[in-house]
Design a protein with these regions (language model features):
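The −1 position to Zn-ligating cysteines in a subset of zinc-ribbon hairpins
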Residues: 13-17, 185, 238-241, 246
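Short beta-strand/turn micro-motifs composed of small residues
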Residues: 9, 52, 106-108
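Canonical Radical SAM [4Fe-4S] cluster-binding loop centered on the CxxxCxxC motif
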Residues: 1-36, 40, 44, 249
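Short, well-ordered coil/turn segments that N-cap beta-strands
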Residues: 1-3, 44-48, 69-71, 128, ...
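Radical SAM enzyme [4Fe-4S]-AdoMet core and its adjacent flexible, acidic
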Residues: 24, 29, 83-197, 202, ...
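Residues at the N-termini of beta-strands
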Residues: 47-48, 84, 129-131, 241, ...
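Conserved SAM/AdoMet-binding glycine-rich loop
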Residues: 11-12, 38-97
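Flexible mid-to-C-terminal extensions adjoining Fe-S/redox cofactors in radical SAM and related proteins
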Residues: 206-254
Length: 254
């Protein structure tokens, strides 16, 4: 059952997951499409999440967006008013002003992760929640997994110290694994769909922002999800018996 509608406000809207955005030229979603998307979300009683590009929107768009309850996902360079702030890489993380009351997503490759311990700890000292998303997880070797294990041990000690001092940050790759008692996947194609600037629905932003993606309907004709059961956890023979509950079970990577 669909519960969330992700609306990409521009072709260059920030990526908040494993995929990179292959679109480099700005193309703002037409105002009429935005209004129609919001109306669709309201009619279907969906939670709406707006994903912003790295530039200020026209005032008209701000008024349209504020006409409905929603969450804002923004790049770190435009984090004012954001519910979720996306930090693209360890280098950007080092210069990002982190504040409480906001969730942060750190997109990084394995090199950045293994070499960015001090920066990650600094983020955790100020953020209430940090999600670390690896952009090259498919390239991991046995040696990388050993490094990852050591990294988690270091972070576990750091987070334990923060908890003892009265600050209780959430870290998806660490505390989620301890707190969750069931799968907490992204739900692309099952509980979440994406509306792109072209007026079409997609399984998730990656299916629009990367080559090889495909639409699953449009605002005019509605959703048309082929073999929709395949997006569900109960049709994933390996995932449904896995206990790595913090895994996002990325539909795009799979």
């Amino acid at each position: 059952m669909i519960q969330y509608l992700v609306i990409l406000l521009d072709d260059t809207s920030v990526s908040f997951c494993h995929y990179g955005n292959g679109h480099k030229e700005r193309r703002l979603m037409p105002a009429d499409t935005l209004k129609a998307g919001i109306l669709y979300g309201m009619k279907e009683n969906l939670n709406i999440q707006f994903v912003y590009p790295d530039y200020d929107l026209p005032e008209e768009y701000d008024k349209i967006i504020e006409s409905v309850d929603h969450s804002k996902i923004k790049p770190a360079s435009r984090q004012k008013g954001a519910d979720v702030v996306v930090i693209d890489g360890i280098e950007e993380a080092g210069r990002t002003d982190v504040r409480s009351g906001t969730a942060y997503v750190l997109r990084t490759d394995k090199t950045g992760l293994f070499g960015g311990h001090d920066i990650i700890v600094k983020l955790l000292q100020h953020a209430d929640r940090l999600n670390i998303t690896l952009t090259d997880v498919e390239t991991f070797t046995d040696d990388d997994f050993d490094k990852y294990k050591d990294m988690l041990k270091q972070l576990a000690a750091d987070v334990e110290k923060m908890y003892a001092e009265g600050h209780s940050p959430q870290l998806n790759i660490l505390t989620d694994r301890m707190m969750l008692d069931k799968m907490n996947n992204c739900g692309a194609g099952d509980t979440t769909i994406t509306l792109a600037p072209d007026g079409n629905f997609y399984v998730c932003p990656a299916f629009y922002q990367q080559p090889g993606g495909y639409a699953i309907g449009n605002l005019k004709d509605g959703l048309d999800i082929k073999n929709s059961q395949l997006y569900r956890l109960d049709h994933g023979p390996l995932c449904r018996i896995c206990d790595a509950y913090q895994c996002r079970r990325c539909i795009w990577l799979n």
